Amino acid sequence: MFFAIVLINQAQTTSFTSIEELAKNKKIDIELKSLGGYQGECVQIDIENITNEALHIWLESGRRLDNLNDAQQDILVLKDQRFNLNAKKTTTIKAFGFCCQSSNRGPRADQKFSIGWMEKDNLLWIAQYLNEHPVDFATMQSAVWVFSNDKNPASILQSKEEGVLELKKAIAKRLNIEIPWYEIYYEKDTNMVFSDKHYNLKGPIQYSLPNRGWLSMVVRGPQKQVMHKFTNTAFVEGGVYNYDVNLSIKEWPKGAYKIEIYLDDILKKQINFSI
C-alpha cells in the first residue's frame, strides 16, 4: 500500500511536457510509422532523449497524427500516455488511436507520420471523452467519424457493452439533439474504411390511438413525397402500439424524413429521422 501511494503521489506532482513541444525544442528525436491498421495501437513512435536530463513526456488524447500520404488516413489519439525517458535513452511506444478521415484509405504498414497537432472543439472533446470512457473499437470509430466527417449519430450502433448508451447520450447532448431512436447501417467497401452508403434503418417506435379505426403508416421524404408504405390500411382497436421499424433505404437521398401515422385518414403522430 505504501509503494502504491508513493507512485500515485509522484504521478500527481510530476509535470509532463507535450511530445510535440519537446520535439520542437530539439529535446527529443521522434519517428512515427504505421503498424498497418487504423484502430487501436496502430502507430509506432520511436523516441530518443537527446538531452542530458530525464524528460517527462506526454502523448495527449486529442492529438492528430498527420499521415504524410494525403490519400491515407490521419489518426486521432484517444488514449493519454505519460512516461519518463532518461537522458540519452530511447524508447518505443504505440499510439492508441482511430482514423479521422473516413473517405481515405487505411494507412499501410510502415507509412510515415508526423507528430501532427492538437485538435480543438468537438474532436478534442470526443477524444478526451473516450480516453476516460473507452468502449468497443467499432463504437469508438463511429463516434470519431460523427465529429471528424459529420456522420449521422445514428451510425453508432447499440451493443451490449456497458457505456455505449452513455456515449450516445453524451454525443446527443454535445450536438444539442435528441438521442436517435433508430440505427443506420452502411455497406462495406474494400477501397475505403467507411463507404457512406446507407442501406438499412432499424429502430422501435411507439404510438397510441384514441379509438378503433383504419390505420395507415407512411414515410415521407425531404420533398414530402411518399417513400414507403408500411402496411395496407388495417382496422385496429384503440390503444398503445409498439412497432419495430425496418426500412430498406439504399436508394434514398440524404435528408429529413417523417413517419406519419394516420387513423381514419387523420394524422395522429409524426416521428422524425434523418439519413
Task: Show the residue positions of the predicted features.
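Short, surface-exposed loop/turn motifs with a glycine/proline- and acidic-biased composition
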Residues: 236-259
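Asparagine-centered strand-capping/turn motif at beta-strand->loop junctions
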Residues: 41-54, 59
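Short, aromatic- and glycine-rich surface loops/edge beta-strands on solvent-exposed regions
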Residues: 217, 253-266
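Bacterial Sec-dependent N-terminal signal peptides
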Residues: 1-14
